[in-house]
Curated annotation (Swiss-Prot):
Biological process terms in GO annotation: translation
Organism (species): Tropheryma whipplei (strain Twist) (Whipple's bacillus)
Gene name tied to this protein: rpsO
Xref: Pfam families: Ribosomal_S15 (PF00312)
GO cellular component terms, semicolon-separated: cytosolic small ribosomal subunit
Its biological purpose: One of the primary rRNA binding proteins, it binds directly to 16S rRNA where it helps nucleate assembly of the platform of the 30S subunit by binding and bridging several RNA helices of the 16S rRNA. Forms an intersubunit bridge (bridge B4) with the 23S rRNA of the 50S subunit in the ribosome.
Keywords: Ribonucleoprotein, Ribosomal protein, RNA-binding, rRNA-binding
Membrane-traversing stretches: none
Lineage of the organism: Bacteria, Bacillati, Actinomycetota, Actinomycetes, Micrococcales
Classification via CDD domains: Ribosomal_S15p_S13e (cd00353)
Protein name as annotated: Small ribosomal subunit protein uS15
Presence of keyword Plastid: no
Length: 90
């Protein structure tokens, strides 16, 4: 399972990165957090009493929200592009 997650992570970085090996841009960070949030949401559907994971999910959602707010303030066109690419609503 860890190998599959690593492959997904590499694909996300190559797709959303501004250059090769770009892991720090807001787009990459938002896309990686979105993937982790989706996986954790699936986990919580099966394990509804896993409160430690639920707290981690809430922290990730808050971090993604702050990154989206930062990106909106820096460049609105990049913000709108990442929302449409990831299927997020704001």
């Amino acid at each position: 399972m860890a190998r599959k997650l690593d492959m997904d992570k590499g694909a996300i970085i190559s797709e959303y990165g501004l250059s090769k090996g770009d892991t720090g841009s807001p787009e990459v960070q938002i896309a990686l957090l979105t993937a982790r949030i989706a996986r954790l949401t699936q986990h919580l559907k099966e394990h509804s009493f896993d409160h430690h994971s639920r707290r981690g999910l809430m922290l990730m959602v808050g971090r993604r929200r702050r990154l989206l707010s930062y990106l909106h303030g820096v460049d609105v066109s990049r913000y709108r592009a990442i929302l449409s690419n990831l299927g997020l609503r704001r």
